[in-house]
């Protein structure tokens, strides 16, 4: 569409059938914004935790549009290198801005709680690992996402609504958590992104559960990746094995499953930053 017969809309073309349809173009914005909500108390966690929220390019310009929610873990590492644990951020906002303005994705809100300094291992793992004597609070953390954080997002931002399913993504233990969430709560999560997931946790328990369990949701989209350098080749043998298990269970590559190998990539933020656009292009197409 054209604005005042002069300015073309950004993003993708709108393909419709004859009839009346609602479309939500935007014309001037070229970048989204990240808002930070710091030192907020969350009763489900009994803790104060910062949350970063990315608002896509069209958010301020088109006030009628509503957006799906993508939960991402380790929010401190996603946007601002100055806040990142190791000084390197994924630049999630830049990746999403580019894809949105090129018309490559459905715009979404990214809601990214910061991880706990001392509780991350417990909150991101579904079972207790006897070797580490830690873990097993993933269900409590997912309850926080779904029953406290999600209602807060719906109340404060324009989303598709409380009843709609959400997406989830993360790296390392956050990738393990994302797979677990989508596999065990298909009514709440419709897709997941697992960057270098820690499939080794608790004797590969989650991967064994996926291999022997029933398919929870045939329309579940899964993005799965790893590098191939560093200790354990960044878990590449296990991620490839999980890819094969999913394909045996009827997932199809480039349909509802995307597998990416980052050649020369190690288990670090810089590598996930290089691959994140591939995940967004697949999950939010």
Q: Can you say where each PLM-predicted feature lies in the sequence?
A:
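The feature marks proteins involved in alpha-glucan
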Residues: 2-43
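A short loop-to-beta-strand scaffold at the N-terminal edge of the catalytic core in hydrolase folds
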Residues: 45-61
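Short beta-strand element of the alpha/beta-hydrolase
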Residues: 55, 63-76
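Gly/Ser-rich "nucleophile elbow"/oxyanion-hole loop immediately N-terminal to the catalytic nucleophile
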Residues: 60, 126-171
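Active-site machinery of serine-nucleophile hydrolases
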Residues: 76-147
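Primarily recognizes the serine-hydrolase "nucleophile elbow" in alpha/beta-hydrolase
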Residues: 162-209, 215-216
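Short, proline-enriched alpha-helix->beta-strand connector loops that line the catalytic pocket
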Residues: 216-222
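C-terminal catalytic histidine-bearing segment of alpha/beta-hydrolase fold enzymes
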Residues: 225, 229-243, 247-285
